[in-house]
């Protein structure tokens, strides 16, 4: 399968093709081989292989803490933005499998990390937050978790924070309005996030 993927490397690979490739591998290999295979794929210089590896690790990390640790510590420092998009999807895969309420300690752990890519895997991966079980019934918890990083030094992360809050404002405008009214808009970082989060508010 690796060889067949290699033939397609010059072409920009859509995310859904990566997901299809992961499903094919998961059905073709014994589960005990997945982790080593994912590590081998992640060592490849072509980002498509690392995207595929990240997807596989996300499936494994639902039950395998070594895979979860690799996602957090190694995948998160990959320089390719596409790999970081797959990390966000992988994190959501883990939370979906374990249950979003049961995953709250894990969500908070990642949100408290020093690496903005780890934090963004949460803020971006769980979008739209209030369509997820638990957060659908508890939008205020989602808003509080996301809003913690409104002033983060990473513009890349603040953009994700603002967009995630804007998503929620479509159904919970008053909750978002209450949140952003407390923000210190003289801080240019917070103002940047505010403009995204409050974009749909009247």
Regions found by a protein language model. Give the residues of each.
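Alpha-helical scaffold domains
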Residues: 4-202
């Amino acid at each position: 399968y690796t060889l067949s993927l290699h033939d397609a490397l010059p072409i920009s690979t859509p995310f859904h093709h990566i997901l299809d490739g992961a499903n094919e591998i998961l059905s073709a290999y014994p589960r005990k081989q997945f982790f080593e295979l994912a590590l081998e794929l992640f060592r490849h210089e072509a980002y498509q292989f690392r995207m595929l590896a990240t997807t596989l690790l996300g499936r494994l990390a639902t039950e395998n803490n070594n895979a979860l640790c690799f996602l957090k510590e190694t995948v998160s420092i990959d320089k390719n933005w596409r790999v970081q998009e797959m990390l966000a999807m992988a994190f959501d895969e883990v939370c979906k499998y374990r249950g979003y309420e049961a995953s709250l300690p894990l969500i908070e752990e990642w949100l408290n990390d020093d690496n903005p890519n780890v934090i963004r895997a949460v803020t971006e991966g769980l979008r739209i937050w209030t369509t997820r079980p638990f957060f659908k019934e508890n939008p205020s918890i989602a808003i509080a978790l996301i809003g913690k990083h409104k002033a983060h030094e990473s513009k890349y992360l603040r953009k994700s924070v603002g967009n995630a809050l804007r998503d929620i404002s479509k159904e919970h405008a008053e909750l978002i309005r209450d949140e952003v009214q407390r923000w210190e808009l003289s801080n240019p970082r917070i103002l940047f996030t505010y403009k995204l989060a409050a974009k749909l508010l009247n």
